[in-house]
Structure formats: C-alpha cells, structure tokens
Amino acid sequence: MKTFVNIFLGFFIFESVGAVPITDTVTYDSEFYDVSLGELPHPFVSAENDQSDQVETEIGTAIPSIIQESYSSAPLTEEPEEEASTPKLIDGSSAQGSGVLVPQTQDGLPTCLLCTCLGTTVYCDDRELDAVPPLPKNTMYFYSRYNRIRKINKNDFANLNNLKRIDLTANLISEIHEDAFRRLPQLLELVLRDNRIRQLPELPSTLTLIDISNNRLGRKGIRNEAFKDLHELQHLYITDNNLDHVPLPLPESLQALHLQNNNIQEMHEDTFCKMRDFSYVRRALEDIRLDGNPINLSKTPYAYMCLPRLPVGNLI
C-alpha cells in the first residue's frame, strides 16, 4: 500500500513541475550599457499580445523607474576649473586705480614698465633717460643713476609728498630749478654726485644727507647760509668740487663733513667753534675731511679746540 502511495505522489509532483511555465531571465550585458532603457526587452511582454501599444506605454512609464533605481546614477556635475590667477595691471585712470601705472614717459610708456617699481621704490638706473620720468604718487625712493638727464625742472617732483630719497648719480645735470626740491615735505636724502652742477638750489629743511660730490661748484655755487636751517642734517659731502671756503654756518646736528679735493686755502677760528665761548664742545661733528686742499691746518689750531677729533688734512 505504501509503495502505491509513494508512486502516486511522485507522479503528481512530476506533473506539477512540468506544468510550471519556463520564462527567460534578463541578464546584464555590456552591449546594452549605452542603449536607452526604453529599448531593453521586458520579460513580461508577449509578441502575441493584442494590446501592444498599451503595454509599451506601461513599460515606458512604470518599469524604467525600477530599472533606473538599479542601474542609473546621479548625473555627474563638472566642478568649474579654477583659472590660474594672473596679476592684473591696475588702470590708474579709473576711480579705483592706485595711480601706479598712470604716469607715462615721453615715449608713451608707463614709468613702471620702462623702469622697475618695487612697492614704493622706483629704479630707473641705466635706462638712457634724458629727463626725470613721471613718478607714481606713492613713490618714496627714486633712483635714476647712470642716465643722460641734463635738467631738473620745477615740477619733476611736484606733489610727491612721500618722497624720502632722490639719487641722480652720474647724469649730465647742469641746471636745477630753484624750487625743484624745496617743496618736498619728507625728503631726507639727496644724492646728486657725479654731475655738472654749478649752482645748488634751495633745499628743504628735512634733509639728513646731502651728497653733491664731483660737480662744478665754485665760490658762488653755494649761497650764504645755505645749510643754516637744515637742523636735521647729519652728513654733508661736497668732495671734488672747486670750493675755496667752508660753507657756513653749519648746523649743530652735522656729524660728517667731507670737503676733500677742493680749493680751500684758509680756515677761520670760528669755522667750527665759538671763540667767545671756550666751554663750547661740538660733540656731534666727529668726521671732517679736508685732505686734498691747499691749506695748512696747523696754522689755525684754535679752530679745532671744540671738536672731539681733529680734521683730516695737511699739517705742513
């Protein structure tokens, strides 16, 4: 009996399994990677279905949403590439411009392209310039050495209220306007050596250093009391000129006076000291150079009594 039952159950299970419909499964194929989802074959679509249009509509609306969740990814967003930062030239003619590139030379070039501008310093050395170029208003230090500048005009340094140093070494300067430097409120150092200057103009009282060596200054080249009101002056260099006297009076602040290689022939006892005040000591003036002049310093010993050091020069 048990054998009959087992045979019956086995036959029933075999028939049930054979009755289950076999369906094709959809597997991922790289060929369909670039095909739109709407073109993929759907397992439930029958070629013999009379309502194919309706089925295609349902496939295009409902089914792809499921497939998209499995295979599609969020669209890639390209991050904007950072452009390389390039220094921009500021047009000083605009309201926001700093004025650095506004001044132009006679050739029509901005000064800071012809010369070298580093911060508030302008270097125009050895540029074959025949005139002082227009300078940015914030210029503090100006160097124009080894050029061909012949004349300093009244307005060459006009409105440069921050200018502290001017160096015009080794040019061909023979003429300087009387007011070329006088109105510079912060000028500290003026270097005019190795030129052809015959007359020293009026100078601002703020100067601490003056170098007019190797020029053509004679008896009338420096006016009387030219340095009297320069109360901050510390260094005065007038070597290699044609002076026949020491320019007086000299400010009390003076520390170094170089007058080598001139034509100074005499020295007064009150040139450096106060003959009526034997207690007077001129402590600041420690460096006096008179060598290269036709003068015998030993003839005027009382002229140096107030000095901390004797001048350098001929004693015979």
Swiss-Prot record:
Free-text tissue specificity from the UniProt record: Preferentially expressed in flattened chondrocytes of developing chick limb cartilage. Also found in the cartilage peripheral zone bordering with bone marrow cavity.
InterPro entries reported for this sequence: Leu-rich_rpt, Leu-rich_rpt_typical-subtyp, LRR_dom_sf, LRRNT, Mimecan/Epiphycan/Opticin
Domain of life where this protein originates: Eukaryota
Signal peptide positions on this chain: 1-23
Protein name, UniProt field: Epiphycan
SUPFAM superfamilies per record: L domain-like (SSF52058)
Disulfide linkage: C112-C124, C273-C306
Domain LRRNT: residue ranges: 100-137
Native species: Gallus gallus (Chicken)
Function: May have a role in bone formation and also in establishing the ordered structure of cartilage through matrix organization.
LRR repeat spans: 138-159, 162-183, 186-207, 232-252, 253-274, 284-304
Modification after translation: The O-linked glycosaminoglycan chain(s) are dermatan sulfate.
Cellular component aspect of the GO annotation: extracellular matrix; extracellular region
Homology family: Belongs to the small leucine-rich proteoglycan (SLRP) family. SLRP class III subfamily.
Coiled coil location: none
UniProt entry keywords in alphabetical sequence: Disulfide bond, Extracellular matrix, Glycoprotein, Leucine-rich repeat, Proteoglycan, Repeat, Secreted, Signal
Gene3D superfamilies associated with the record: Ribonuclease Inhibitor
GO BP: any one term: articular cartilage development
Subcellular location(s) per record: Secreted, Extracellular space, Extracellular matrix
